[in-house]
C-alpha cells in the first residue's frame, strides 16, 4: 500500500494522462474537427498573447485588441502569422483582470522554442486548455465515485462526453471552462480532508479563496454560478448528516463549514476586485477614473441597473433559456436532449422516487440528493436572474451554462435514485463521516 502522498501523486498523474488521451482522441484541440465557440471574445486573448509576443506593454496588463472592431478574426490572424504591430494601436479590454491572457501569453512564449508556426502554437494552447478541463471533470468524477459509486461517476462524466457545446467550447481561451470548476474542486478537497482527518485543515479555507480569486481574474461573468457550485458539496454533507444520519449537531458543524466556505469564496472575490481596481488605476491614471469604469462595467451586468443595455425582464430570460432554446445539451447519435426535456425527465424521475421512497419509509434519504439537484439547477439559473441583459444578449452561452451544474448532476443522480428505489437496499449510499 502506497503512502497517501504517493497515492495522491499517482492519481493526479493518471488523471492528467487520461485527460490528455481524451483531448487527443476526441480532437478537442482541433478548431477544424470540433469547431470553436466564441470567436468574438477569444480575440481579446489573441490580442494580449500577440502583445506579449511582440514584447510590448500597456498599463494594467489587460486583454485587448489591435483593431477597432474586436469581434472579427483579425487579431487571431496577427497572432498566427506573427505580424508586426504598433504598440499604440492596442486597445485594452478593462472589464476584467485578464489573467488567462497573461497565462497563455507565457505559455505561448515557451512554446515558441519548439513550435515556431503560429497555427501549431494555437493548437497546442487549445490542447492544453481542453486537457485541463478534462482533468478538472475527472477529479469531480472521482469525488462522485467516492461518495456515490462508480456508476454515478460514469453517468456524470458521460454528460461531458455527450455534450456538443462542451466538446466545442472547452478549448476556448477566453472562457477557460476549467477555471469554472476550481471553486467546486476546492470545496470537494475540503470535504475529503475533513472526512479523512475528522476536522477541516486550516489550509482548505485559503484554497477556496484562491480558487474563486483565480476564476474571477479570468472574468466575473457567471459569478453566482460558480459560487453556488462551491457550496453544493457542503450543503449535501449537512443535509446527509441531518436527514440520513439523524445527527443535528453534525449538520450544524457542516453548516458552519458551509458558511466558512462562503466567506472564503467572497474573500477571494474581494481580492480579485482589489487587483482589478489596481489594474484600472494603472491603466487610467487615477482612482476616480478607475472607479467610474469599474462601476459602469458592473451596472451594465446587474439586473437592477442593466435596463439601458437591453429592455428585457427576468421571466423573458428564463423562458429563453428553459423553453425557447432548442440547442441540444446532450447528443448521442440522432438522439438529442434539450434543457426543457431534461428538466421534465428529471422532475418525472424525482416524482417516482418520492412515491417509491415514501412507500418504503426511506424518503429521508432522498433529501440530500434533491438538495444537490436543486442547487445544480439554481447555479445556472441564478445568473439569468442576476444579469438578465447579459444572459439575453449572449445567446451562445445558453447551452453551455446548463453544464454548470444542472446537466451533470441530473445524469449523476439517475443511478443514485435507482439504487434508492431497488427493493431491499435500505443502507446508506455512502460511508458516514
Task: Please name every model-derived segment.
Residues 82-123:
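Short hydrophobic/aromatic helix or loop-helix immediately within or flanking a transmembrane segment
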Residues 118-126, 156-182, 212-213, 217, ...:
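Aromatic- and kink-enriched transmembrane "portal" helix at the membrane-lumen/periplasm boundary
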Residues 124-152, 357:
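Transmembrane-helix motifs of polytopic, lipid-linked glycan transferases
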Residues 136-141, 327-367, 414:
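Hydrophobic, aromatic-rich transmembrane alpha-helices
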Residues 178-181, 391-421:
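Hydrophobic/aromatic-rich transmembrane helices and adjacent perimembrane loops
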Residues 203-222, 226, 264-265:
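Membrane-interface alpha helices of multi-pass inner-membrane proteins
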Residues 258-346:
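Membrane-lumen/periplasm interface segments of specific transmembrane helices
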Residues 361-390:
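Transmembrane alpha-helix segments characteristic
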Amino acid at each position: 500500500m502506497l503512502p497517501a502522498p504517493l497515492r495522491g501523486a499517482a492519481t493526479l498523474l493518471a488523471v492528467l494522462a487520461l485527460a490528455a488521451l481524451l483531448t487527443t482522441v476526441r480532437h478537442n484541440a482541433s478548431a477544424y474537427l470540433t469547431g470553436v465557440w466564441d470567436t468574438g471574445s477569444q480575440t481579446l486573448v489573441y490580442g494580449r498573447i500577440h502583445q506579449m509576443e511582440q514584447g510590448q506593454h500597456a498599463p494594467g496588463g489587460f486583454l485587448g485588441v489591435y483593431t477597432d472592431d474586436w469581434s472579427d478574426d483579425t487579431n487571431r490572424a496577427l497572432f498566427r502569422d506573427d505580424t508586426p504591430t504598433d504598440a499604440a494601436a492596442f486597445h485594452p479590454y478593462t472589464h476584467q483582470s485578464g489573467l488567462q491572457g497573461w497565462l497563455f501569453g507565457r505559455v505561448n512564449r515557451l512554446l515558441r522554442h519548439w513550435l515556431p508556426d503560429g497555427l501549431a502554437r494555437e493548437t497546442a494552447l487549445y490542447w492544453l486548455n481542453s486537457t485541463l478541463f478534462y482533468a478538472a471533470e475527472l477529479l469531480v468524477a472521482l469525488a462522485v465515485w467516492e461518495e456515490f459509486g462508480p456508476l454515478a461517476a460514469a453517468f456524470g462524466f458521460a454528460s461531458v462526453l455527450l455534450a456538443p457545446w462542451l466538446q466545442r467550447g472547452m478549448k476556448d481561451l477566453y472562457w477557460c471552462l476549467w477555471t469554472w470548476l476550481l471553486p467546486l474542486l476546492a470545496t470537494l478537497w475540503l470535504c475529503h480532508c475533513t472526512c479523512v482527518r475528522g476536522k477541516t485543515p486550516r489550509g482548505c479555507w485559503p484554497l477556496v479563496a484562491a480558487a474563486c480569486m483565480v476564476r474571477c481574474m479570468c472574468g466575473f461573468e457567471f459569478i453566482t454560478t460558480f459560487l453556488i457550485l462551491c457550496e453544493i458539496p457542503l450543503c449535501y454533507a449537512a443535509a446527509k448528516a441531518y436527514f440520513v444520519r439523524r445527527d443535528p449537531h453534525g449538520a450544524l458543524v457542516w453548516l458552519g463549514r458551509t458558511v466558512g466556505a462562503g466567506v472564503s469564496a467572497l474573500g477571494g472575490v474581494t481580492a480579485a476586485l482589489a487587483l482589478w481596481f489596481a489594474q484600472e488605476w494603472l491603466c487610467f491614471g487615477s482612482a476616480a477614473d478607475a472607479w467610474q469604469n469599474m462601476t459602469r462595467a458592473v451596472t451594465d451586468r446587474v439586473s437592477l441597473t442593466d435596463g439601458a443595455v437591453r429592455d428585457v425582464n427576468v421571466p423573458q430570460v428564463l423562458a429563453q433559456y428553459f423553453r425557447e432554446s432548442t440547442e441540444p445539451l446532450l447528443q448521442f447519435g440522432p438522439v438529442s436532449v434539450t434543457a426543457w426535456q431534461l428538466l421534465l425527465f428529471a422532475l418525472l424521475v424525482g416524482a417516482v422516487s418520492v412515491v417509491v421512497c415514501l412507500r418504503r419509509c426511506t424518503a429521508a434519504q432522498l433529501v440530500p440528493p434533491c438538495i444537490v439537484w436543486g442547487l445544480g439547477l439554481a447555479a445556472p439559473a441564478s445568473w439569468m436572474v442576476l444579469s438578465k441583459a447579459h444572459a439575453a444578449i449572449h445567446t451562445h452561452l445558453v447551452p453551455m451554462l446548463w453544464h454548470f451544474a444542472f446537466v451533470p448532476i441530473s445524469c449523476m443522480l439517475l443511478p443514485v435514485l435507482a439504487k434508492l428505489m431497488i427493493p431491499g437496499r435500505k443502507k446508506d449510499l455512502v460511508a458516514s463521516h
